[in-house]
């Protein structure tokens, strides 16, 4: 069964074991954080699942789409000009279905169209730092799709571990940038959101 899963993910056992080793090493600190979060929310015996996503800290900072766009283009353009240019194209050419509306599905996703070398991104942007992070995440998938443009069609299906690496990296780079100017309360909110989201990846 493991061999089949590894083949499907295009991953060797050594890579999987390295990932599990990193997870095991980080787990004690992550558990301590969630115990502390539980205490902060009034739970003495750990954090119940129903409060996993309960917000902590306080952030009144919101972003317009224009501010989110400028932040992402500047940050990712400096990191990788090709990624910054792809993001500019995504914003300017209408790749992104940005806002929530009646009848629209919740959440977010990205779908690539190989023949046209474009992607389509759906988000429900309401202006929070988490929404900007979600946008960065989905545009990470779009950039991964863009990088596959010279591959044969049969090689363009990205296995989940690789697909989530690109998008999670984008979130991490963005959060690192936001932390540079965050107040202590905003810092707590950003870090909590980041850690909580990682339990789902």
Predicted region positions:
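Cation-handling catalytic/transport regions enriched in His/Asp/Glu
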Residues: 1-201
């Amino acid at each position: 069964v493991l061999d089949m899963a590894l083949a499907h993910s295009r991953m060797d056992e050594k890579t999987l074991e390295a990932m599990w080793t990193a997870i095991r090493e980080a787990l004690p600190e992550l558990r301590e954080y969630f115990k502390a979060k539980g205490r902060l929310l009034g739970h003495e015996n750990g954090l119940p699942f129903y409060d996993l996503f309960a917000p902590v800290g306080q952030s009144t900072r919101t972003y317009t789409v224009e501010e989110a766009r400028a932040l992402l283009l500047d940050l990712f353009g400096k990191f990788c000009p090709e990624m910054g240019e792809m993001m500019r194209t995504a914003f300017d050419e209408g790749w992104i279905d940005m806002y929530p509306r009646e009848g629209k599905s919740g959440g977010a996703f990205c779908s690539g169209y190989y023949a046209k070398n474009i992607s389509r991104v759906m988000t429900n942007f309401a202006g929070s730092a988490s929404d900007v992070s979600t946008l960065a995440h989905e545009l990470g998938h779009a950039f991964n799709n863009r990088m596959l443009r010279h591959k044969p069609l049969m090689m363009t299906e990205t296995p989940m571990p690789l697909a989530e690496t690109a998008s999670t990296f984008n979130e991490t780079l963005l959060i690192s940038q936001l932390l540079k100017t965050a107040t202590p309360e905003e810092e707590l909110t950003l870090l909590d959101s980041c850690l909580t989201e990682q339990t789902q990846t």
